[in-house]
Every structure is written in structure tokens, then in C-alpha cells.
């Protein structure tokens, strides 16, 4: 018999999903746009205030980009207060959110694998967590601890489809990823394969 008949390993993507890469990039670019707009409105307002209080504006030769900002403000650009200030505020929030999101992607929080090993008679559930004491979540159980495989399907706006590993002592361990639920067909297929592989009952379907 080949290795597949003794060992099954299911990989969990975690935070490194395409949708997370997409939204983290969009928010980062958008926040930069807000910040640049707010900063440019502040520079333009400062230049205008300086020009009004100084009689030597005509004798000054401003750098090209500063003069462009001044001219844009005089032709209908936003004022720093309150519009520009709000732009800076929302841009800063968006930037911090995108940095946090990129950190989650870099750490791959929630990613890992489930290994079912008949050859050595153990089940291993591995997940990456946040940096610190619980960075690695590595759980081991024996195959004898498994009583059944249970599938939970919650319909609605935030639909959830989860496979649970039911252990002795009424313990249940979720073994599917969070944030990107599998389709009903994928859940049924994976749960059935796992129940047949472990030779335990399947509940919830």
C-alpha cells in the first residue's frame, strides 16, 4: 500500500488568501491617496497664509511642486480644515489597517495543516498564530480518541460550514479554515473522505 493509504494531510490557507492580498493592497493605495491629498491641502493652505501676511511674495521663487500646489488650491482644491484634516485622519486609519493586514498575511495567522497518520497512530493539528507565546499551535491526539466527524452548516448572511473532530470527553476540534468557507460539495467530500479514512461515523449530513 502507498503512503496515501496511511497518511492524509489537509492544508489550511489562513490569512494568505487572494482576497486578503487584494483588499490589503487596495486599502494601502487608497490610504496613501487620502494622506497625500490631506498633506497637499495643508501645504497649500500654509503657502496661501504666508503669502497673505508677506509683502515679498512676488520676489520669492517657490519650488515648482509648491507653486503647483498653491495654484491648485486657488482653483478649487480642498481646504485643510476641515476637509484636508479629515483626509489625513482617514488616510492614517487606512494606512494602519493595511499595515496590520499585511502583518497578518506575513505571519499567515490561521494557516497550517491537519495530518491524520494511521502509520504512527496520531492526529496532528498545526496552526500559525500571532507572534509570541502561542505563535505555533501544535496539537496531537491518538486515533483512538476520535469518536466521529461532525459537519455544522449555518445558513444566512454569514454562512458557516465547519468540520469538527469529535473526541472522547465531548470535545470538539474545528479542523477547517476560518474566513473562507468551503462550498457545500467540498465540505461533504472532505468530511466523507475523512470519516471513511478514520473509520468513524459522520454526523450532520
From Swiss-Prot:
GO biological process: photosynthesis
Subcellular location: Plastid, Chloroplast thylakoid membrane
UniProt keyword terms in alphabetical order: Chloroplast, Membrane, Photosynthesis, Plastid, Thylakoid, Transmembrane, Transmembrane helix
Membrane topology type: Multi-pass membrane protein
Organism superkingdom: Eukaryota
Cellular-component GO terms for this entry: chloroplast thylakoid membrane; photosystem I
Primary localization class, coarse: plastid
Pfam families: Ycf4
TM segment ranges: 23-43, 86-106
Family (UniProt): Belongs to the Ycf4 family.
Entry function: Seems to be required for the assembly of the photosystem I complex.
Record protein name field: Photosystem I assembly protein Ycf4
Organism: Tetradesmus obliquus
Organism lineage: Eukaryota, Viridiplantae, Chlorophyta, core chlorophytes, Chlorophyceae
Amino acid at each position: 500500500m502507498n503512503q496515501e493509504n496511511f497518511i492524509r494531510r489537509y492544508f489550511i490557507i489562513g490569512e494568505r488568501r487572494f482576497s486578503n492580498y487584494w483588499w490589503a493592497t487596495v486599502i494601502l493605495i487608497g490610504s496613501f491617496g487620502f494622506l497625500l491629498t490631506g498633506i497637499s491641502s495643508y501645504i497649500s493652505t500654509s503657502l496661501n497664509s504666508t503669502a497673505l501676511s508677506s509683502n515679498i511674495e512676488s520676489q520669492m521663487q517657490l519650488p515648482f511642486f509648491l507653486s503647483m500646489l498653491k495654484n491648485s488650491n486657488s482653483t478649487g482644491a480642498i481646504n485643510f480644515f476641515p476637509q484636508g484634516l479629515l483626509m489625513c485622519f482617514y488616510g492614517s486609519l487606512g494606512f494602519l489597517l493595511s499595515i496590520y493586514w499585511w502583518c497578518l498575511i506575513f505571519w499567515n495567522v490561521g494557516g497550517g495543516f491537519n495530518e491524520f497518520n494511521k502509520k504512527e497512530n496520531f492526529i496532528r493539528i498545526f496552526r500559525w498564530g500571532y507572534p509570541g507565546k502561542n505563535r505555533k499551535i501544535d496539537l496531537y491526539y491518538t486515533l483512538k480518541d476520535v469518536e466521529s466527524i461532525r459537519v455544522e452548516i449555518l445558513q444566512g448572511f454569514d454562512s458557516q460550514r465547519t468540520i469538527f473532530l469529535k473526541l472522547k470527553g465531548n470535545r470538539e476540534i474545528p479542523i477547517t479554515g476560518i474566513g473562507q468557507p468551503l462550498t457545500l460539495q467540498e465540505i461533504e467530500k472532505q468530511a466523507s473522505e475523512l470519516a471513511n479514512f478514520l473509520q468513524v461515523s459522520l454526523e450532520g449530513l
